[in-house]
Structures are given as C-alpha cells and as structure tokens.
Amino acid sequence: TDEWCEFFHENNWLVGVSIDGPQEFHDEYRKNKMGKPSFVKVMQGINLLKKHGVEWNAMAVVNDFNADYPLDFYNFFKEIDCHYIQFAPIVERIVSHQDGRHLASLAEDKEGALADFSVSPEQWGNFLCTIFDEWVKEDVGNYFIQIFDSTLANWMGEQPGVCTMAKHCGHAGVMEFNGDVYSCDHFVFPEYKLGNIYSQTLVEMMHSERQHNFCLLYTSPSPR
C-alpha cells in the first residue's frame, strides 16, 4: 500500500521482492494462497516501491523451468530497472510429516525423493556461466548480482556479504509473521526455532547456545 511504502521510504528500508523472472517463469510455481498466478500483484508492488522511492532488490529462485533461459531471465530484471539481484537455486527433497509439511529438513534431506522443481547441477552451472559472460561485458558496476559480487569479495580476501560464502554463519536469522525466530531463512523448521520475539529479544536469541550450536554445523568438517 502507499502507506507502507511511505513508511519504508521514511525509515530507509531495503525491501526484498521475491520474483522469479518474467511472467511465464514466475507464474510456473509462484502461486498465491488461492493457487492463482501472482506475477501481476508482485509487479504492482514493485511499481508502488518505485513510486515512493523505496530501495528494493530481487530475490529470484532458479528452478528446473526457468534455469534453461538464463538470458531471458537476466534481461527481464534489466528491463524492470532492477539493479540488485539475488539468485537462489532451489533443491529440495520431499518427506511427508504428520503436521502437513512436505519439505525435508536438514536431518532428513537424504531420506526423500528430489522434488521435481529442483534445479540440476548442470542447469545451475550453465545458468550462472551464461549470465556471467553477459554481465561481465558491460554491466559490472551497474547491475549487482550477489553471487558474483560475493565470489569476487572472497577472491580479494574481503567479507563476501552473504553467509553461505562466509567463513562463519549464524548472523542471518529470520522472523516469521507471528514473531517466531529461526536460525536461518533456509532452515525454517521446528528443530531450528530459537524462540519468539514476544517472549525474548533478538539479541538473546541470536546469541543463544542454540544458535551457537547451529553455527557449528556450518564450521564442522562434515560435508553437510
């Protein structure tokens, strides 16, 4: 709404928008709670952000469908004047749970079948290489792609700015709509819940022993 966008602008928020490329790509999997396509509504939201001068970036999931069209995917973001882009490859396993969940948690990810929408290693590699070859020609310094920027930062001995490429993780907790806080936005499962903002502070939860133990999973020599 205009009211929310005014709030974001006044308080210097950076808003992340989940959008998976042009309409035919986005609507393949991004449905609303009624099972309807969501692209039109997402673009309406982006236009509202632009109207109020709110800074925003795109968080784009790369799946089995859109990964085969890397340049169409990348050029779309340039067309809508998006200069900050995060690509997130989706790889999930399916495991049924009594509470209705169907995605496998970290401890279960070897038990279930790979979800049909998962991007393959070959697709993901080709996707990145194709976009990089286009980006490096004339877009460096104008369009910022997180995985490329973070890779360069690591190469130069700088902090990469993204936890998955950093030496240590554990600073990217996530809060759900009801105040529940989890160790990481990639692991919103019951076993990684830290607490709730209504009963504990973020500082307490993010510096808790539970969060410390989660960080150790990342620094462990185990390939997991």
Residue ranges and their predicted role:
Residues T1-N11, Q23, N47, K51:
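Conserved Radical SAM active-site core
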